[in-house]
UniProtKB/Swiss-Prot annotation:
Catalytic activity: archaetidylserine + H(+) = archaetidylethanolamine + CO2
Species the sequence originates in: Methanocaldococcus jannaschii (strain ATCC 43067 / DSM 2661 / JAL-1 / JCM 10045 / NBRC 100440) (Methanococcus jannaschii)
Gene field: asd
Subunit structure of this chain's protein: Heterodimer of a large membrane-associated beta subunit and a small pyruvoyl-containing alpha subunit.
Modified residue annotations for Pyruvic acid (Ser): 172
GO BP field: phospholipid biosynthetic process
Name of the protein in question: Putative archaetidylserine decarboxylase proenzyme
Modifications the protein undergoes after translation, according to the UniProt entry: Is synthesized initially as an inactive proenzyme. Formation of the active enzyme involves a self-maturation process in which the active site pyruvoyl group is generated from an internal serine residue via an autocatalytic post-translational modification. Two non-identical subunits are generated from the proenzyme in this reaction, and the pyruvate is formed at the N-terminus of the alpha chain, which is derived from the carboxyl end of the proenzyme.
Alphabetized HAMAP family for the sequence: PS_decarb_PSD_A (MF_00664)
């Protein structure tokens, strides 16, 4: 019996340590500057796509989701998808400062991942931030393991660049929607850090 108690104690301690590690929220020195867009998440750049018609999409777990935010990006936009592993810090931060003009939450499906013949839908949040005449978007996409993403902001709120805006649990993705008049400064496979890595710079010919 003592052997089982020891095993149980080790398992509980391991789970507790993992939980504390997963929910860690380390202090960050936020990168400052004008005409830049910061990464909203820690992770690895998974894809970079350009949409000429301004109607962007995001991709997760084999699914493609149209975001229906083309009214904010009439001249086209880039979408940078950032994969967040369970070992990454999962706190999301604002890529720019500005005012929250749009938030939309889409519920995910709660069917078991192994069930066939059922459309599996990732829970996600879409956030649009306005700064001057420009808009930048952040999309939280939860994985099927946890299916949980939440925001600590609301529409109409003014936020600062690098401010914490929410969190996603376990394996997940954060995407950022960037106006077409910016140059992307990261590459697929590159590591990025929320509030610190510059992922786009406004072109000077505009």
């Amino acid at each position: 019996m003592g052997k089982y108690k020891k095993f149980f104690a080790i398992a509980v301690c391991s789970l507790l340590l993992f939980t504390v590690y997963f929910y860690r929220d380390p202090d960050r020195v936020i990168t400052k500057g004008n005409n830049i867009i910061l990464s909203p998440a820690d992770g690895t750049v998974e894809y970079i796509k350009f949409y000429e018609n301004g109607n962007p999409e995001v991709f997760k777990d084999g699914n493609c989701y149209v975001l229906n935010v083309s009214r904010y990006f009439p001249n086209g936009c880039y979408v940078v998808g950032i994969f967040m592993s369970p070992l990454d810090v999962h706190v999301n931060r604002a890529p720019i400062g500005g005012r929250i003009v749009y938030i939309k939450h889409i519920d995910g499906s709660f069917y078991p991942a192994f069930l066939e013949g059922v459309e599996k839908i990732n829970e996600r949040n879409i956030v649009i931030i306005k700064n001057g005449s420009e808009y930048v978007g952040v999309v939280q996409i939860a994985g099927f393991v946890a299916r949980r993403c939440w925001l600590s902001i609301k529409e109409g709120e003014c936020i600062n660049m690098g401010q914490k805006i929410g969190m996603i649990k376990l394996g997940s993705q954060t995407a950022v929607i960037i106006p077409a008049n910016y140059n992307i400064t990261v590459k697929v496979g590159e590591r990025v850090y929320a509030g610190q890595t510059i992922i786009a710079v406004k072109r000077t010919d505009n």
